[in-house]
Amino acid sequence: LECIQSKKYDLILNIMKILHTSDWHLGKRLDTYSRHQEQVEVLDEIIRIADAENVDIVLVAGDLFDTFNPPVESIDLFYKSLKCLANNGERAVVCIAGNHDSPDRIEAPDPLARECGIIFVGYPNSEVPLFKLDSGLEVIRSEAGFVELKLPHCNEPLRILTTPYANEIRLKSYLGVDDPETELRKVLKDRWQQLAEKYCDISGANLLLSHLFFTKEGATLPEEPDDEKPILHVGGAQAIYTSDIPSQIQYVALGHLHRKQIIDQEPCPVVYSGSPLSYSFSEANQTKYVVLLEFQPDKRASLKPIELHKGLPLKRVRSQGVSEALEWLKQNPDCLVELTIVTDAYLNASDRKLLNQTHQGIIQIIPEMLQGTDSDGNPQTTNINLSKGIEELFAEYFQHTKGLPPDPSLMELFKEVIANKKDF
């Protein structure tokens, strides 16, 4: 009853409620550790927030999956979660592809999804078919890169400029530009402006939904997350300036960066909602959010970040020796750990076994070797570079423990053992 009364109140005030989320990365692992159960729990939390806040539409700004070919359990979780969010067509859900997603996979279930009020946009030039549901949800107008919706419990329409991820060459191709010298920024700015002038007036809410790298011109670029496929690289897509956004747009809902952040407030809030879980140790201790927006015609969007509480915290821990590490692990069981141990000798197999038996959430153990002292008597350390090849690491270990390098015959034997293990 409270939900119905609240929705009637919003309708009287012409308030449209939008929930912005992104970067679900379903199927993501932390090294070999599955995050599936955490993803189940955090998506259920997002569904509960959407229900509690009487949200009219949910926007998912790309990186729905972590790979082009996600596991079956992740696909199942994705569709079941969207169906719950859509609430039998009473609430619209719009999802776009990110740089981790296969656009064809994202769009494949679109005909069936539309029957539930779910819209998938895989490509920058995708055009959403017109449709109307018994709930009152309707696509009123549509063309490549644009969709206008009539939401069941809102008086005013919602206009969305949709720009899923594509690399620079493909983006230009999709938007009909063949000149390789034309800047991507100009191509997008011109296209967005054309759509905004055609469709986005003050009689409805107007927003941009994208999975690209936005920045304020002249500002320091935000860091792309660790373990993330970067966008800013040769063959990717250049950074887009907030000044390229049409003045008619009231909010820009972005995906790609995993930390919730407001890139700019002009010409409107330009916001990365961030991922719902911490997916790498560079995100350790980050608080995760979804962003609730309240729209009224011809007014600035009102933002309310809502904190998410599900998922195991990620911890980076540095300990002086194995004993100190064991004590910390016993006192902090409910987390995922990147453990650095300062030691004067390589960790042996029994030490590693004891550490892993003590804590089920150890993702990586990094030995930090003592290398004597500096001129002031302070201990000097160096991390073992785990990005090196296994053969190089073995040679360094042998040198450290024996005081001389392994001879060629021993290295050949080591290579044979490793090869047999891979075959096995």
Q: In which residue ranges do the predicted regions lie?
A:
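N-terminal active-site segment of His-dependent metallophosphoesterases
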Residues: C3, Y9-E90, D104, S409-F424
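Divalent metal-coordination and catalytic microenvironments
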Residues: D23, L43, D63, F78, ...
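Short beta-strand segments at enzyme active-site cores
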Residues: D56-G62, V93-A97, A205-L209
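Accessory, non-catalytic peripheral segments of nucleic-acid enzymes
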Residues: I57, E294-F424
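His/Asp/Glu-rich metal-coordinating catalytic cores
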Residues: P70, D101-P267
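A short helix->loop->beta-strand "cap" motif at the edges of active sites that frequently abuts
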Residues: N87-V93, I249, C268
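Binuclear metal-dependent phosphoesterase catalytic core
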Residues: K132-E138, S142-E156, T163, C268-N332
